[in-house]
Regions:
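Sequence-structural signature of mature extracellular/luminal beta-sheet repeat domains
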Residues: 1-166
């Protein structure tokens, strides 16, 4: 029995279809942003717990980075969704992190977490969500109001619209 339904046979020319799904982790309340590290493990954001988890196939989940989306939990304006979300690596193995609580994109080199993009036109970002690093190093990310109070745009503090940036 195949684990997915195939509607167009042509898809087999582009993706593997001979696989079985495997549950790697079920201990998170809301996880997002999975990314594969070439050293042989997965990272993912556990948003409400404000951590990035690490899964090495065949081993239990471990914490890779704490305070991944919000560095000052006491002052978080997004208490339920303050953690990181989207994750992406660049060619130099830096991890770029969408930070809901800090309203920013951070850069992590494996030792130091630093703010990378903190605002646009002198206003904080809303709630950076998904991120991709292109071959040339360009960074693309989305910035919807997810996590903001009632998921509403708040132009006096943050961006006046949900945006997509490069």
């Amino acid at each position: 029995m195949h684990p997915i339904t195939i509607y167009q046979e042509e898809i087999k020319n582009y993706i593997r279809t001979d696989f079985e799904l495997e549950l790697l982790n079920d201990t998170c309340s809301f996880s997002e942003g999975p990314v594969w590290n070439k050293e042989g493990y997965y990272l993912f954001s556990d948003i409400p717990n404000n951590i990035i988890g690490k899964i090495i196939p065949g081993k239990p989940k471990e914490v890779y980075l704490q305070k991944s989306g919000c560095s000052n939990v006491e002052e978080a304006e997004l208490p339920r969704m303050m953690g990181s979300n989207g994750l992406a690596y660049d060619a130099d193995k830096n991890l770029f992190i969408c930070q809901h609580g800090n309203h920013a994109i951070a850069k992590y080199d494996g030792k130091t977490l630093v703010p990378f993009i903190t605002s646009y036109q002198n206003k904080k970002l809303n709630s950076p969500n998904d991120i991709v690093v292109a071959k040339d190093g360009s960074i693309f990310f989305s910035d919807p109001p997810y996590g903001l109070k009632d998921q509403k745009i708040s132009p006096e503090k943050y961006q006046s619209r949900a945006g997509f940036y490069c």
